[in-house]
Amino acid sequence: MVMTDPIADMLTRIRNANQMSHLKVLVPASKLKLEILAVLKKEGFIKDFYLPQSSREIIISLKYSPNKERVIKGLKRVSKPGLRVYASAEQIPKVLNGLGVALVSTSKGILTDAQARLSQVGGEVLAYIW
C-alpha cells in the first residue's frame, strides 16, 4: 500500500502511542522524519530516537513527566499533500502564543517557528506541536 503522507502517519503514530502511554513507538525511516525527530528531541517533546543499522524503522522513546503526564499535549499536521501551506518569516504563526512549536521546512532544514523567525527564513509549515 502506498502511503501518501508519511509525516502525517508518523505524527499519528506518535499521537496514538502517547495517548495510550506507550514508552516507544516504531515508524518507517526517512531523512525528513529523522530531521523532524531531532527538532522534537531538542525542544523536549520526545526522550530519544534511534535508527538501528539493520532496520528500516526508527524507534522513538516518548517522554512523560515524573507523575506520568504526557509531555506532548497535541499534534496537528498543517501542510498536507493536497494543500501545501507556506509562510514567510513574518507570517509564521505562534502556536498557543509561544507555548507550542511550529515545525517549518526551510532552505536551512527543519526549524522551529522561533528559529525560522530569527534566521529570517520562511518555508512550508509542516506541523504544530504543543
UniProtKB/Swiss-Prot annotation:
PROSITE patterns: RIBOSOMAL_S8. GO terms for biological process: translation. Keywords: Ribonucleoprotein, Ribosomal protein, RNA-binding, rRNA-binding. GO terms for cellular component: ribonucleoprotein complex; ribosome. Pfam families: Ribosomal_S8. One of its GO terms (molecular function) is rRNA binding. InterPro entries: Ribosomal_uS8, Ribosomal_uS8_CS, Ribosomal_uS8_sf. One of the primary rRNA binding proteins, it binds directly to 16S rRNA central domain where it helps coordinate assembly of the platform of the 30S subunit. Belongs to the universal ribosomal protein uS8 family. Part of the 30S ribosomal subunit. Contacts proteins S5 and S12. NCBIfam families: PRK00136.1. This is Small ribosomal subunit protein uS8. It comes from Aster yellows witches'-broom phytoplasma (strain AYWB). The lineage of its organism: Bacteria, Bacillati, Mycoplasmatota, Mollicutes, Acholeplasmatales. The gene is rpsH.
